[in-house]
């Protein structure tokens, strides 16, 4: 079982060589760093999930974390409103083919039951929140009882998301956008303190990943996973 200290050590070691690795990579500098930070956040979130379940005394064999596509079927109410008769009839005759596969970064299953979904981002701004909410909304049309989370390394949402207070009041813009997706009830957790700055990226202006905040993330998930132990 990976410990919180080991998560922090991994974060430190990767971020401190990220700039050098990006310059040596055959990939575009910016693209390499975006991918690296995204994968790092997915790793951290995955380990936090495991620690939370372990702390609750859950059997690791009962826990499955994946990102398999969720099949979202076409809505019949939409099909019946299609004005072009031939198009409408064609879709109805082939209705089993009409679906959309969608996923977020972490789908948490306990005993095969889908109970929680977590989107992982190196950072989030409000333009990205709209896409995240749409994804969760579509998933919840099929799996209405899951809990939805956004785990981000840094915040660019304004408000106090990046201040890491015990009670997060959020931002005017983010709450306004989320109010149009009432079925989602998105929980946003930020790991690094300080609003993201485009001119001060964390691979050159290092931000520490603090033990207490990772522990808070663990406790947050424990609160939602406890009923499934």
What are these regions (language model features)?
Residues 2-30, 34-35, 50-58, 142-229:
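C-terminal tail/extension regions appended to the core domain(s) of diverse proteins
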Residues 34-46:
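Nuclease catalytic cores
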Residues 36, 48-74:
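Long, mid-chain structured domain cores
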Residues 64-109:
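Active-site metal-binding core of divalent-cation-utilizing nuclease and nuclease-like domains
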Residues 106-108, 114-122, 132:
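Conserved catalytic cores of phosphodiester-cleaving nucleases, focusing on short active-site segments
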Residues 137-141:
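Substrate-engagement module of ASCE P-loop NTPases
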């Amino acid at each position: 079982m990976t410990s919180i200290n080991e998560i922090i050590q991994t974060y430190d070691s990767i971020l401190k060589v990220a700039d050098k690795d990006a310059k040596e990579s055959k990939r575009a500098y910016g693209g390499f760093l975006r991918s690296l930070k995204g994968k790092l956040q997915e790793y951290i979130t995955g380990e936090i999930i495991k620690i939370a379940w372990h702390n609750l005394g859950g059997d690791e064999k009962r826990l499955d974390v994946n990102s398999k596509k969720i099949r979202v079927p076409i809505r019949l109410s939409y099909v019946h409103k299609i004005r072009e008769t031939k198009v409408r009839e064609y879709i109805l005759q082939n209705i089993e083919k009409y679906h959309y596969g969608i996923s977020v970064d972490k789908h948490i299953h306990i005993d095969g039951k889908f109970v929680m979904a977590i989107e992982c981002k190196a950072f989030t701004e409000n333009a990205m929140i709209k896409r995240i909410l749409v994804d969760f909304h579509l998933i919840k049309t099929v799996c209405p009882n899951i809990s939805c989370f956004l785990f981000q390394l840094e915040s660019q949402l304004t408000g106090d998301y990046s201040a890491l207070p015990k009670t997060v009041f959020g931002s005017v813009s983010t709450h306004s956008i989320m109010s149009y997706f009432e079925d989602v009830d998105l929980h946003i957790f930020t790991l690094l303190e300080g609003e993201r700055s485009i001119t001060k990226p964390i691979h050159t202006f290092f931000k520490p990943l603090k033990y207490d905040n990772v522990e808070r993330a663990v406790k947050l998930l424990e609160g939602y996973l406890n009923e499934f132990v």
